Amino acid sequence: MQFKDILYEVKDDYANIAINRPKVLNAFTPVTLQELKAALEVAEKDKEVGIIVLSGAGDRAFCSGGDMNWESSKEFQDHEYEFHIHLTKCSKPII
C-alpha cells in the first residue's frame, strides 16, 4: 500500500507507522488522518504484527497536532474523530 503522508514498515513483530511531514513538524491533514487509519487497519489485520508503534519523521517533533490550514474544516474534524475511534478500538497495543 502506498502512502503520501506516512511511512509504514513492518520489522520483526511490530509495525512502525511514522507521520512523514517533518517540514511542518508532522502536523496532520485530512489525508494524513486517512492514511493513519488505513495503516492501523493493515497492521491490525496482519497476523505477523504484535505491536504498533506510532512515530514522527525527523528529529524536531513527533507531531505538532493538526495542520492549522485544515483544522477548522468539517472534513478534518470527521477524519480526526474516525482516527481516534480506531485508535481506541484497536485490538493490538499501540506505543
Label every PLM stretch briefly.
Residues 48, 56-90:
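Glycine- (often His-adjacent) and acidic-residue-rich active-site loop
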Residues 1-55:
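Conserved CoA-thioester-binding segment of acyl-CoA-metabolizing enzymes
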Residues 92-95:
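A short, small-residue-rich loop immediately preceding and capping a beta-strand
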